[in-house]
Design a protein with these regions (language model features):
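Non-catalytic C-terminal interaction segments of nucleic acid-processing enzymes
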Residues: 1-40, 53-149
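Conserved catalytic cores of phosphodiester-cleaving nucleases, focusing on short active-site segments
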Residues: 43-49
Length: 149
């Protein structure tokens, strides 16, 4: 659904493995605009389909891989995107398959946010592609205007 959105909007896509996150941004080489080589933005989005995926990532046998992902991304803008507009509410109410205590989960995620400097957003799945595109679009716009890129 994310690639469908980007393709419908004629947004160029480059599939490649990232060291961290599921989505990144690349400004292609365009000498006409003074971009002599492709520029890769140091920013990532990690997509989770629902709260069950997050609680699954925090189980004893999987939490190390999840935390390692956060460690690799702690020095760049990083967002954990949950495709559930009501994900925060579901977390507080314990509406997920895991037996994870809701307040322990809230505490764990907020501790990780503070420790690894990332944010969590909850978005309706039908808007995920739109959110990801505009997230990177406005970062790039800011960085170009500020002369950072």
């Amino acid at each position: 659904h994310i690639l469908d959105y980007l393709q419908q909007k004629d947004i160029p896509i480059k599939n490649q493995k990232l060291d961290t996150g599921d989505y990144g941004c690349m400004i292609p080489k365009n000498e006409e605009f003074g971009i002599p080589r492709a520029i890769y933005l140091d920013s990532r989005v990690e997509r989770k389909a629902h709260m069950d995926e997050i609680t699954g990532n925090l189980q004893k046998d999987t939490q190390t891989a999840f935390e390692n992902e956060l460690i690799r991304s702690k020095d760049i803008p990083f967002t954990l995107l949950v495709e559930d507009l009501h994900g925060y509410e579901k977390m507080l109410q314990g509406k997920y398959r895991s037996k994870y205590n809701p307040f322990a989960l809230l505490g764990r995620l907020n501790t990780f946010k503070a420790k690894y400097n990332f944010e969590i957003v909850y978005v309706d799945k039908k808007f995920t592609g739109n959110w990801i595109y505009h997230h990177f679009y406005y970062q790039v716009k800011h960085y170009l205007r500020a002369g950072i890129l």
